[in-house]
Amino acid sequence: MTIAVGRAQERGWFDVLDDWLKRDRFVFIGWSGILLFPCAFLSIGGWFTGTTFVTSWYTHGLASSYLEGANFLTVAVSTPADSLGHSLLLLWGPEAQGDFTRWCQLGGLWNFTTLHGVFGLIGFMLRQFEIARLVGVRPYNAVAFSGPIAVYVSVFLMYPLGQSSWFFAPSWGVTSIFRFLLFAQGFHNLTLNPFHMMGVAGILGGALLCAIHGATVENTLFEDGQDANTFAAFTPTQAEETYSMVTANRFWSQIFGIAFSNKRWLHFFMLFVPVTGLWASAIGLVGIALNMRAYDFVSQEIRAAEDPEFETFYTKNILLNEGLRAWMAPQDQIHENFIFPEEVLPRGNAL
């Protein structure tokens, strides 16, 4: 018998770090966590700081913090001033020159929150890839999460990059998001944009599929327990099915005449519909960033202008958009000092 005697091979720092990052713990860290956790912490922390203390007086002429009297629905971390263009607004940059108070007044926290937020989302997507690899499953969760990332990037980065400055991006707050919705409708007629329509169909369709699927599974659970609560009869490791696909198929065949007969196709469809909708929405936002127009039904507009008795929901909406632009712009872009005389303000066709 031969016995080999020798020292164990020394492990490099990379292997030691790899083992520590992937150690089994309550909250998995992983390599993705190096990006995810700091960026998520700083982005969320920046939002709480801004909504608590920081005014929007110097950028939007608004009160936007709890300190000034706003509430949860009206606080916001506001976009920088229009005059700052697409500056990264670094704390040590030429605008703030290391002055934290000045940096907050200029809107630096919006850049801080948004840019750390996008890298946090990318880190979360990488986390799903990493854990899928370690557990040994396919990475469709990460693929699905590309939808929210695409919308985030298109709304908060691509849209303002296509416009004159970060000022026109949504500020981080509830009512400030509503302001962005009204702005996008008034200036881009977004609801008539086919990509926005596909996005609405995808999100509402996904919600409908989710509700139908959940209800159908609950309807066709096997009677395999004695309790009034059916949840207690299920264990995650059981080999048996917990509901009857055959019965579900029969039910929907009677309702619609057609039904899913393949669970894999059914669940892929539930993935496909909302994610495709989110991708389509992101494409639409890039379009309006470049000021591409939605559908224009010019013949209806010409006839409505000539005939006071002819009006469609389309021409009515065009007038509403004119109103949004005329009355919103002086409030929204106070730095432009817009003054519109009475004769240029929109009026209904019949007046």
Swiss-Prot record:
PSII is composed of 1 copy each of membrane proteins PsbA, PsbB, PsbC, PsbD, PsbE, PsbF, PsbH, PsbI, PsbJ, PsbK, PsbL, PsbM, PsbT, PsbX, PsbY, PsbZ, Psb30/Ycf12, peripheral proteins PsbO, CyanoQ (PsbQ), PsbU, PsbV and a large number of cofactors. It forms dimeric complexes. The D1/D2 heterodimer binds P680, chlorophylls that are the primary electron donor of PSII, and subsequent electron acceptors. It shares a non-heme iron and each subunit binds pheophytin, quinone, additional chlorophylls, carotenoids and lipids. There is also a Cl(-1) ion associated with D1 and D2, which is required for oxygen evolution. The PSII complex binds additional chlorophylls, carotenoids and specific lipids. Chlorophyll a ChlzD2 binds at H116. The keyword Transmembrane applies. This is Photosystem II D2 protein 1. One of its GO terms (molecular function) is chlorophyll binding. Photosystem II (PSII) is a light-driven water:plastoquinone oxidoreductase that uses light energy to abstract electrons from H(2)O, generating O(2) and a proton gradient subsequently used for ATP formation. It consists of a core antenna complex that captures photons, and an electron transfer chain that converts photonic excitation into a charge separation. The D1/D2 (PsbA/PsbD) reaction center heterodimer binds P680, the primary electron donor of PSII as well as several subsequent electron acceptors. D2 is needed for assembly of a stable PSII complex. It is a multi-pass membrane protein. GO terms for biological process: photosynthetic electron transport in photosystem II. Chlorophyll a PD2 binds at H196. Pheophytin a binds at Q128, N141. Its EC number is 1.10.3.9. Pfam families: Photo_RC. Keywords: Chlorophyll, Chromophore, Electron transport, Iron, Magnesium, Membrane, Metal-binding, Oxidoreductase, Photosynthesis, Photosystem II, Thylakoid, Transmembrane, Transmembrane helix, Transport. The keyword Zinc does not apply. It comes from Acaryochloris marina (strain MBIC 11017). Fe cation binds at H213, H267. It is found in: Cellular thylakoid membrane. It catalyses: 2 a plastoquinone + 4 hnu + 2 H2O = 2 a plastoquinol + O2. It is an enzyme of class 1 (oxidoreductase). The chain crosses the membrane at residues 39-59, 123-139, 151-164, 206-226, 277-293. HAMAP family: PSII_PsbD_D2 (MF_01383). 2 of the reaction center chlorophylls (ChlD1 and ChlD2) are entirely coordinated by water.
